[in-house]
Amino acid sequence: SSDLVCEKMNQAVCRYGTEHHIWSMGSTMAMLLFTPESMFACNLGDSRIYFMDGGKLQQISTDHVFGGTAVGKAPLTQYLGLPEELQRLEPSVTEIEHKEGYRYLLCSDGVTDMLSDSEIEAILSQDMEIPEIVNDLLKNALQKGGRDNVTIVLCEVQKLDTVRRMKEWMKNLKDKK
């Protein structure tokens, strides 16, 4: 389950911090989980997951931030590296529809702090290949200031036959081990 995946990632980050004497270490996270029947969006922190449907951008992740602050950015309420003894990790998980041609954007706040949703939507709506769109998002985020790291993953659901081929590929990888 996504909760278990997040728990294991969190433990790994906490363990690394402890082993290397880093007491303030963390990361946001956004991921898509695929099963043969469905797809799930999961996030911690303020990294976002968007969905493009008919040219309209929709945020499907939840920002885990403390209420608005007068100055600067709101602190995160959930993130990888959050010690279990301080607070329980509660990732946001949403089951989402997947159809051929649907596009999903996973990105860090290095994108969303620099570009508005309407700017992101305009870039994603362009009739270009995925690598070109990613480069355009990156270029625009950096031109607007790029004060934080800029992480972008853009994926498009292909024909369901691709899912079958991917399963075979994964099975072959396991068989080789």
Residue locations for each model-derived region?
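PP2C/PPM-type serine/threonine phosphatase catalytic domain
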Residues: 2-177
